[in-house]
Regions:
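Aromatic-rich, lipid-facing transmembrane alpha helices and their immediate juxtamembrane interface loops
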Residues: 53, 59, 71, 108-110, ...
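Catalytic cores of alpha/beta
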Residues: 13-26, 66, 70-90
Length: 121
């Protein structure tokens, strides 16, 4: 119904199984975010990031996958995008930074650098 009225859908999930079940509903964006890591400054391990993206893409390659939880700086953003995520989340990483505006800028630059690196001609 959301598509019919022009609304985008974003759904958060914790586990690979949850993400796979939700992917069958075809949201526009899935947020892969292990609950136990939210606000800890500890990012998901590489296996979780790659497995969640792979699992969602096998069901519906049109769903964007955002990785959340523990993203605290530009390097975390860069690394996560390089693993295949289309985006990252970062609430605590920004709001707990000494200079939140500078952290947003750092993260945006890291996103751009990773995007450019992944899409080199």
């Amino acid at each position: 119904r959301a598509d019919e009225v022009g609304l985008g859908t974003i759904v958060c999930a914790d586990t690979v199984d949850e993400l796979m079940a939700i992917a069958k509903l075809s949201p526009n964006l899935l947020v892969a975010e292990p609950t136990e890591l939210i606000g800890t400054g500890k990012t998901s391990d590489e296996n979780y990031v790659t497995q969640t993206i792979k699992s969602v893409r096998e069901i519906n390659p049109d769903i964007m996958v955002l990785q959340g939880a523990g993203i605290k700086n530009g390097q975390d953003v860069y690394d996560t995008i390089m693993l295949g995520a289309e985006a990252t989340g970062s609430t605590s990483g920004i709001f707990c930074a000494d200079d939140p505006a500078a952290m947003v800028e750092e993260m945006i630059h890291a996103l751009r650098a990773a995007w450019d690196e992944k899409h080199k001609a």
